[in-house]
């Protein structure tokens, strides 16, 4: 990692976008647990960073600070951020930084008996599970464990590239207005 990105040593802290925005508002530098879980840098149970992975990849451990929980207070709005709006000191509640988990929290009736599909930059198919699923089958079939709100977990299968396919379809339909996915799949075969 360091050979490819020597500037990583100059960094003070790694913050995904949702955590960076919270830092700019509160001054608290932490990474929210649901977004951390999809980086593949947490222990399988999603409770802490996997420092063994950092060491093997040559990633400085100092970049990865505390984890925060969604739905819990994580600092207050700073005076400098409030800048005269009269909201300095108002508590900030962390949200699920991973967009799929935020969407799942709004899905009515989602429990361990139902599956979900999330469409965004990728296509995610999954189900709530009691604990992370760690076995040869899930690894072989490329399933991932996603940490959720309140200690929940989802076993998910990612189908990346949905956004790319949509952009391609947009361009192709300029030339062939009625182009559909079936025709694209047939041409790909």
For each feature predicted by the language model, list its residue ranges.
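Buried hydrophobic packing segments
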Residues: 1, 25, 41, 103-107, ...
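A short helix-loop
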Residues: 2-5, 10, 27-28, 54-56, ...
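Short acidic, glycine/serine/threonine-rich loops at helix termini
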Residues: 25-30, 77-80, 105-109, 127-132, ...
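Short glycine-aspartate micro-motif
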Residues: 14, 92-100, 104, 114-118, ...
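Gly/Ser/Thr-rich active-site cleft segment
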Residues: 1-98
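Conserved A3 ("GATE") glycine/threonine-rich loop of ANL adenylate-forming enzymes
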Residues: 37-39, 98-102, 119-124, 144-152, ...
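Short alpha-helical "patches" and their helix-cap loops
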Residues: 11-13, 32-42, 116-122, 176-188
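Short coil/turn connectors at secondary-structure junctions
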Residues: 9-12, 36, 62-63, 87-90, ...
